[in-house]
Amino acid sequence: MNKRFQGKVAVITGAAQGIGRRVAERMAAEGGRLLLVDRSELIHELADELVGVAEVLTLTADLEQFAECQRVMAAALERFGRLDILINNVGGTIWAKPFEHYQEREIEAEVRRSLFPTLWCCHAALAPMIEQGSGAIVNVSSVATRGIHRVPYGAAKGGVNALTACLAFETAERGIRVNATAPGGTEARHGGFRNSAEPSEQEKVWYQQIVDQSLDSSLMKRYGSIDEQVEAILFLASDAASYITGITLPVAGGDLGCQSCSVMFSVSG
């Protein structure tokens, strides 16, 4: 097997399940030394599975809090002595409904879930990467920056895209690359709503409209697999992408998300 990450130290957030878990499994198999973070205790089960495969440290943390992100990066430095790769994978739609139906607390919760963990972790990772003169950051965004029933989530992920571009400008000459992937609809075991309430019949209809739009927007007319998302993340994190920084790569079967709007405006202008 290719050992693209031999000896590299990577922090992977949101690693207990889904895309983050598969990234961790693949990096471990390819020689990475990993600090895996999630708010769920399931993260420790993954560490047990990777015993004998890679050197792994797991932490539970609420990465919506600035201090927790600082604690995670400090733990990585204490254990491994350096930080080569950061994969920011925390986020996800909590509610799915037209914007006028959101309450203030729900809007704030969506932004806090899908923007702040990435913002805080990028900030916390900068000092060791700048000191080393190298590093690769991959932020997991979304093509949902253009779509229905997820305006606060789309705004948060739009912030991730802007963070990616701006931070790449600031850090490129210091040897740090910053990129993002923008997944489209993706088959996952834990899809759908991410709040504890039982969805109403109307909420189920709204969510199905998101699914239908995702399929209609994709040229391939299907959902992607977790492995298809992971391949893009691993590529951007690896040395094979050494001349790539500041991009948000749509991985959505041809759906470009908000980038399609930018292309349209630039052509018409």
Curated annotation (Swiss-Prot):
For this protein, what reaction is catalysed? (1R,6S)-1,6-dihydroxycyclohexa-2,4-diene-1-carboxylate + NAD(+) = catechol + CO2 + NADH
Which CDD domains is this protein grouped with? DHB_DH-like_SDR_c (cd08937)
Q: Can you tell which superkingdom this protein's organism belongs to?
A: Bacteria
Q: Which InterPro entries match?
A: BenD, NAD(P)-bd_dom_sf, Sc_DH/Rdtase_CS, SDR_fam
Q: Which residues are catalytic?
A: 153 (proton acceptor)
Which EC numbers does the record give?
1.3.1.25
Q: Which GO terms describe its biological process?
A: benzoate catabolic process via hydroxylation; fatty acid elongation
Q: Kindly list the positions annotated as binding NAD(+).
A: 11-35
Q: Does the keyword NAD apply?
A: yes
EC category name: oxidoreductase
According to the UniProt entry, its GO molecular function terms are:
1,6-dihydroxycyclohexa-2,4-diene-1-carboxylate dehydrogenase activity; oxidoreductase activity, acting on the CH-OH group of donors, NAD or NADP as acceptor
Annotated keywords: Aromatic hydrocarbons catabolism, NAD, Oxidoreductase, Plasmid
Residues reported to bind substrate: 142
**Tagged with keyword NAD:** yes
Q: Pathway of this protein?
A: Aromatic compound metabolism; benzoate degradation via hydroxylation; catechol from benzoate: step 2/2
User: What does this chain do?
Assistant: Degradation of 2-hydro-1,2-dihydroxy benzoate (DHB) to catechol.
Stated family: Belongs to the short-chain dehydrogenases/reductases (SDR) family.
Q: How does it assemble?
A: Homodimer.
Full protein name = 1,6-dihydroxycyclohexa-2,4-diene-1-carboxylate dehydrogenase
Q: Which organism was this protein described from?
A: Pseudomonas putida
